[in-house]
Amino acid sequence: MVKIGVLGLQGAVREHVKSVEASGAEAVVVKRIEQLEEIDGLILPGGESTTMRRLIDKYAFMEPLRTFAKSGKPMFGTCAGMILLAKTLIGYEEAHIGAMDITVERNAFGRQKDSFEAALSIEGVGEDFVGVFIRAPYVVEVADNVEVLSKHGDRMVAVRQNQFLAASFHPELTDDHRVTAYFVEMVKEAKMKKVV
């Protein structure tokens, strides 16, 4: 069974743990740097990206997260997690982890009161997935090697680049675990490649 970490500094941690377990993987709440060595994949949960960055810096997680990104193990960022994975952020000079060749705009769908749900078609996942958008970012631009998995209107809201997956919405806030299951499969495939 693969072991998937959920970065436990802030955000929808419990919900991700539940979704990972429902998808047939072991979930670990990552609160210490050394735990990164024990896991096969990592979820960066939604939350407040500025607060999350402050906590990442406070607990000296940034370099270990960048090292994890370079290790070939899959990472999945939802909402604020997408912001952490992006190489370019509109209105900001520097990236956070910067592992994905995507340009992201923060709070692109408006503030908390503008939160909404929308039925999405997601490549590799299926139709009618309810995307929960809460002060969500969206992907403005992608490099050629980034696969766009879903759009809401003309806005890119789910993307994949090799072992990295990112979504504007919160898949963990529904009882539909298909997006998490997709990530679990990515982790299983990556682990199999390592073994071979």
Swiss-Prot record:
It catalyses: aldehydo-D-ribose 5-phosphate + D-glyceraldehyde 3-phosphate + L-glutamine = pyridoxal 5'-phosphate + L-glutamate + phosphate + 3 H2O + H(+); L-glutamine + H2O = L-glutamate + NH4(+). The active site is at C79 (nucleophile), H170 (charge relay system), E172 (charge relay system). InterPro entries: Class_I_gatase-like, PdxT/SNO, PdxT/SNO_CS. It comes from the Bacteria. Pathway: Cofactor biosynthesis; pyridoxal 5'-phosphate biosynthesis. Keywords: Glutamine amidotransferase, Hydrolase, Lyase, Pyridoxal phosphate. SUPFAM superfamilies: Class I glutamine amidotransferase-like. GO terms for biological process: glutamine catabolic process; pyridoxal phosphate biosynthetic process; pyridoxine metabolic process. One of its GO terms (cellular component) is cytosol. L-glutamine binds at G47, E48, S49, R106, I134, R135. One of its GO terms (molecular function) is pyridoxal 5'-phosphate synthase (glutamine hydrolysing) activity. The keyword Coiled coil does not apply. Gene3D superfamilies: 3.40.50.880. Its EC number is 4.3.3.6, 3.5.1.2. In the presence of PdxS, forms a dodecamer of heterodimers. Only shows activity in the heterodimer. Catalyzes the hydrolysis of glutamine to glutamate and ammonia as part of the biosynthesis of pyridoxal 5'-phosphate. The resulting ammonia molecule is channeled to the active site of PdxS. Belongs to the glutaminase PdxT/SNO family. This is Pyridoxal 5'-phosphate synthase subunit PdxT. The gene is pdxT.
